[in-house]
Amino acid sequence: MPLKKLVLSSLSLLFLNQCTKEDELALPSCIEQKIEALKKEAVWNPPAKIYRYNYQNQYVYFFPQRCCDIPSELYTENCNLLCLPDGGLTGEGDGKCTDFFKTRTEPLLVWEDTRKE
């Protein structure tokens, strides 16, 4: 009986260990570079966030707008700017991906600036 408990305890620890913060999503290096650049800027209000979505059968990275007339940005995994989904002077972005908010799937917050102002 003690062996069974030992095995179960070991398996439990193994599974718990698999869910640590160290095993977070591996981001493309160009997205990591954009995060490092954001960390060098003053804290945005609201704080900067980056989301990953599946859009048109590819993973894309969405940088929400930080204020009124500043457009949000949508990048491919290679950091090619796909479009500006919203924001800007009209609030409707650049018009290149008008279906983004309706057709995106698999939302995942991949980074949030947690620095204090």
Write out the residue ranges for each language-model feature.
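Sec-dependent signal peptide recognition
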Residues: P2-S9
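C-terminal motif of bacterial Sec signal peptides marking the signal peptidase cleavage site
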Residues: F15-Q18
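Bacterial signal peptide processing site
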Residues: T20-E22
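N-terminal secretory signal peptides
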Residues: L27-R52
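Exposed beta-strand-loop-beta-strand "reactive/processing" segments of non-cytosolic proteins
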Residues: Y51-C67
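Structural motif
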Residues: D69-S72
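C-terminal partner/receptor-binding element of secreted or periplasmic proteins
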Residues: G87-E117
